[in-house]
Amino acid sequence: MKQDMIDYLMKNPQVLTKLENGEASLIGIPDKLIPSIVDIFNKKMTLSKKCKGIFWEQ
């Protein structure tokens, strides 16, 4: 399920923006965790732009 969420956010970056603005939520994820998820995801994306690739642990 975690990998599905990551795939979805990578394919739909507008959802990440809506999460940041409080315009969307993730089913099954408490609202209080959303800022942490957005922060981590943004850090990973920033790092991936500096690298040739990014690898997710499975």
Swiss-Prot record:
Q: Which Pfam families match?
A: ComX
What else does the entry mention about this protein? The DNA sequences encoding ComQ, ComX and the N-terminal two-thirds of ComP show a striking polymorphism, which determines the specificity of the quorum-sensing system in the different pherotypes of Bacillus. In ComX, the sole conserved residue is the modified tryptophan essential for the activity.
Q: What GO terms in the biological process aspect are recorded for it?
A: establishment of competence for transformation; sporulation resulting in formation of a cellular spore
- Lineage of the organism: Bacteria, Bacillati, Bacillota, Bacilli, Bacillales
> Which residues in this protein are found as Tryptophan derivative?
56
Location of the protein in the cell: Secreted
* One GO cellular component, as annotated: extracellular region
Modification comment: Trp-56 is modified by isoprenylation, which is essential for activity. Modified by the tryptophan prenyltransferase ComQ before export to the extracellular environment. The type of isoprenyl derivative differs among the different pherotypes and depends on ComX primary sequence.
Primary role: Part of a major quorum-sensing system that regulates the development of genetic competence. Acts through the activation of the two-component regulatory system ComP/ComA composed of a sensor histidine kinase, ComP, and a response regulator, ComA.
Subunit (UniProt): Interacts directly with the sensor histidine kinase ComP and stimulates its activity.
Keyword Secreted among record annotations = yes
Indicate the residues removed as propeptide on maturation.
Answer: 1-52
Cysteines joined through disulfide linkages:
none
Q: Does the keyword Cell division apply?
A: no
Q: Which UniProt keywords apply?
A: Competence, Lipoprotein, Pheromone, Prenylation, Secreted, Sporulation
Which Gene Ontology molecular-function terms are recorded?
Answer: pheromone activity
Q: This chain belongs to which protein, by name?
A: ComX pheromone
Q: Which organism is the protein's source?
A: Bacillus subtilis
